[in-house]
């Protein structure tokens, strides 16, 4: 058999974020769970990976003050926030045959923010 499991985490699960202990803990937990499942299910031909989006221009971000958004852009090597399609491409890749040997990975789609 074979299959794909693609979990959703967040870059804050990798680097932490002030004042968000509960959110950071759950997203870091998803990364750990992804690694364990990759080991357990890999023998059955199932790959397990995670996508960790960075700050992405969605409706949720519309309430963030422009000053904060500017600060995020300034800290991001690519100089912008992500678009939903940027995140979607990571999922498409992990679901594809081209990713058949990728297992236990967390892909950070963040424009380099976590470097």
Which residue ranges define each predicted feature?
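Hydrophobic structural elements of the Rossmann-like NAD(P)H-binding subdomain
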Residues: 6, 48-51, 61, 104, ...
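Residue(s) in the substrate-gating loop at a strand-loop-helix junction
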Residues: 10
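Conserved catalytic-site region of short-chain dehydrogenase/reductase
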Residues: 13-15, 115
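Active-site helix of classical SDR
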Residues: 26, 34
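Short, flexible catalytic-loop segment of classical short-chain dehydrogenase/reductase
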Residues: 31, 52-63
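Alpha-helical segment proximal to the catalytic Tyr-Lys
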Residues: 39-43, 100
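C-terminal helical subdomain
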Residues: 50, 74-98, 102, 111
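A short C-terminal helix-loop "cap" of Rossmann-like NAD(P)-dependent dehydrogenase/epimerase domains
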Residues: 62-76
């Amino acid at each position: 058999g074979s299959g794909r499991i693609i979990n959703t985490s967040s870059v804050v699960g990798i680097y932490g974020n002030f004042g968000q202990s509960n959110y950071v803990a759950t997203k870091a937990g998803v990364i750990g769970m992804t690694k364990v499942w990759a080991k357990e299910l890999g023998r059955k031909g199932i790959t397990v990976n995670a996508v960790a989006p960075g700050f992405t221009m969605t409706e949720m971000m519309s309430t963030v003050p422009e000053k904060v958004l500017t600060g995020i852009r300034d800290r991001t090597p690519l100089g912008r926030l992500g678009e939903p399609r940027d995140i979607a491409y990571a999922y498409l890749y992990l679901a594809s045959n081209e990713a058949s040997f990728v297992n236990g990975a967390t892909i950070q789609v963040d424009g380099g923010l976590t470097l």
